[in-house]
């Protein structure tokens, strides 16, 4: 199946990532359909749009918007699928719903985005565990360099768990400063974000 303007994708695994392996048992973390934090965001590309060229190829793994696989309840309490839904294993998504793609072993950001890993709090008197609005560029579209220490505007991030690491998706236009490394910066990844 091909679409003229949409990517055709299928979820990698289930629609929701709401279980965690504890020993030989599965622990259910969430049973609500409306909580976006437990929606699967990884997908496999089945086909690319036919109307234009794209960097993404069939077979690539992509990170998509949290509403793509999400189910929700309408005003009458009926469960509905997202507007991307075609059938249980097929979804149609627009290019602006894809933020990151993986070819072979490398993650690459879509144009206009980069993914930033937060750093640990350097001030021992601060109660926060991570520095606010500062991080290390992990994946980029080429505008910023991987490994750069950058600052970004407040409320401009969106949290993702990618390969067991918590990262923030930041639009390039919201990166406001590039810092020099001081040598005491350390990436921060909370234990709950790590893969089991």
Task: Spell out what each predicted region is.
Residues 1-196:
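Acidic-enriched and Gly/Ser
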